[in-house]
Amino acid sequence: MSGEPIRIDPISQPQAEAEDAALEVTEAQERQGEQMSAATIPTHGVMEGGGSYNLHARIPAGGGNLALPYLEDAARSLAVRPGTDPLVLADYGSSQGKNSMAPMRAAIRCLRSRVGNERAVMVVHVDQHANDFNTLFDVLHNDAERYSVDDPNVFPFAIGRSFYENVFPREQVDLGWCSYAAVWLRHIPALIPGHFASVACTGEVRAAFDLQAADDWRLFLSLRARELRVGGRLVVVFPGLSDEGATGFEPLFNSANEILGEMVDERVVGADERKRMVLGAYPRRRAQLLEPFGREDQFQSLSVEHCALFDLPDGAWTDYQLDGNVESLGSRHAAFFRAIFVPSLASAISDAGRRLAFADLLEQKLKRRLCERPAPFHSFVQTMVLAKQAPAVTPPARSSPSK
């Protein structure tokens, strides 16, 4: 073997201290740059194109569905501006759009009950410039569940920009939605010896990921606080961690990690390429999400209205228990891994033709391994609802009476 792969155990990981200023991340970037040069940083966080994510991202879809009541409540409780200006809904991290249809439809329905059918609603889908926007536009135009099918006053838009940058001018967004996207870090701070998943790292590497995650979360919140209107709401959905530090995907990640080691031994993947295969996904605990808000429960004019953790059932496992079709179970789990995680791993391979062959072979091997070891994904969903408050007004100082 080229190096014994490590396994992920659901053990508690220390929470790193976050820095005070959300946007002052230059020093952190310099420290992380010492661990991982720019030449070794793979791209990450872009899903597999051609509609693959839409077909196989049932777990993120299920997590988003659990949060729909919170989104509907946010749409009912946000402050609606008087007048006729369009209401703005922001879909941060839209990917290829399929998983955005139900949330946007639910939010629009709740807003329509408040403002009627004539007021314009702008829905802006935001994702990285390398996202498969062609599939997104096809969904918006042709999907039977598209949110604009019976509403001529709904206007979809798309922006190809990272949500770790300014996406909108100040105070333009009435309602924001971000589902399963903010789990991806802005930068990968370090290579992970023996594995590709951040939940497997320890020591200095763990500290680097903890620091990057704390900085990125504060940056994300600060940018959204600028973009939200006073009285607006932001709903954020994450793949969560249990109190024991488990993601629920440990069997899947460990199987894939073993296969990557075998592919190095078979010389399908180079040892240096394997070292650069890192996922920039970082699931967070509730305490890590709440840390920026402090004792006063506020950060950058944002306050926490809800923060809840849910268990997410594995639909593929439920079907397997009913029909006993282990081939279908393995196929669905392997296709899920490929659509969401393999593009990030494959970005460590420079040749496009080899990347496709790598993805095909990894999926085939992973399916066989998962069929040999059938197991459910016992994953978790963390949902937050944030409200934008008006800035506190400091009363003028009273002048001392003249003597």
Located regions from the model:
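N-terminal charged/capping segments associated with class I S-adenosyl-L-methionine
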Residues: S2-P14, A18-P156, G160-E171, W184-C201, ...
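Soluble or luminal CAZymes and related metallo-dependent hydrolases
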Residues: L66, Q212-D216, A281-R285
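Short, conserved SAM-binding segment of the class I
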Residues: E171, D216-L223, E227, P292
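Short SAM/SAH-binding signature in class I
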Residues: E171-Y180, V235, F380
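Mobile active-site "lid"/loop adjacent to the S-adenosyl-L-methionine
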Residues: C178-L219, F238-K275
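Substrate-binding/catalytic lobe of Class I Rossmann-like enzymes that use SAM or dcSAM, i.e.
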Residues: V230-S350
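Core SAM-dependent methyltransferase catalytic element
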Residues: S379-P401
